[in-house]
UniProtKB/Swiss-Prot annotation:
Lineage: Eukaryota, Metazoa, Ecdysozoa, Arthropoda, Hexapoda
Gene that encodes it: Prtl99C
InterPro entries the UniProt entry points to: HMG_box_dom_sf, Protamine-like
GO biological process, one term: chromosome condensation
Primary location recorded for the protein, binned into one broad class: nucleus
Name the record gives this protein: Protamine-like protein 99C
Highest taxon above the source species: Eukaryota
Ranges annotated as biased composition (Polar residues): 94-104
Region (Disordered): 93-143
Length: 201
């Protein structure tokens, strides 16, 4: 009987020749061509595996650049970098590494936690504001220039006494006189017009 052949350890083949690929309208094929140029010597299985991983992580603008045949300025990661990145574990925070993407369900849970925290903070802030006593305010606070009602009463009174003035001149003159009136005189125009008595200025 012949001797049994032992199993040989598998070694990835090294390709010494590289064909020149054409640039196509397919962005993924152009990306694969660029990946093959950068990491020449990979087996077809490894090239497809790691190139497909990085393609899924590219943004739409980066994918569009490969489709429009623009010169690539994207930093591609070698298979060794991917393996090292996947082996890293964030012990401190228990978060995923920067090379791995969160699943849609994980992103949804994280956004729900953030929204619930923000709602809790808003409710606590509102409760604190409700607990503070509000300063007592008068029902009708008047500024030192008087209220709008008082100014309108004064403007009507002034218009009746100066019918010859144009609208622009009437407003300018009335405003100037209103600002010069003492506060007690301005306060008198809070009452109806037939009660106010004003002399010609």
């Amino acid at each position: 009987m012949g001797r049994k052949r032992g199993r040989k350890e598998y070694c990835p083949p090294i390709y010494k020749r590289q064909k020149v690929a054409r640039v196509t309208n397919n962005g993924y094929l152009n990306f694969m061509t660029e990946y093959k140029k950068r990491f020449y010597g990979l087996s077809p299985q490894d090239m497809v595996h790691y190139a497909a991983k990085q393609w899924t992580q590219l943004s739409m603008a980066e994918k569009e650049a490969f489709k429009s045949k623009k010169p690539s300025t994207i930093t591609l990661k070698s298979p060794a970098q991917y393996v090292a990145c996947e082996m890293k574990s964030d012990v401190a925070g228990g978060q995923q590494s920067s090379c791995q993407r969160q699943s849609p369900s994980a992103r949804l849970r994280e956004s729900e936690r953030r929204s619930s925290r923000s709602k809790t903070l808003c409710r606590s802030a509102k409760n604190r504001q409700r607990g503070k006593p509000k300063p007592q305010q008068s029902k009708r606070r008047l500024s030192h220039m008087g209220s709008a009602v008082a100014y309108i009463h004064f403007l009507r009174k002034f218009q009746r006494k100066n019918t010859e003035l144009r609208t622009i001149d009437l407003l300018k003159t009335a405003t100037r006189l209103w600002c010069r009136l003492p506060e007690r005189h301005r306060h008198a125009f809070e009452r109806p017009l037939w009660i106010v008595t004003i002399g010609k200025s």
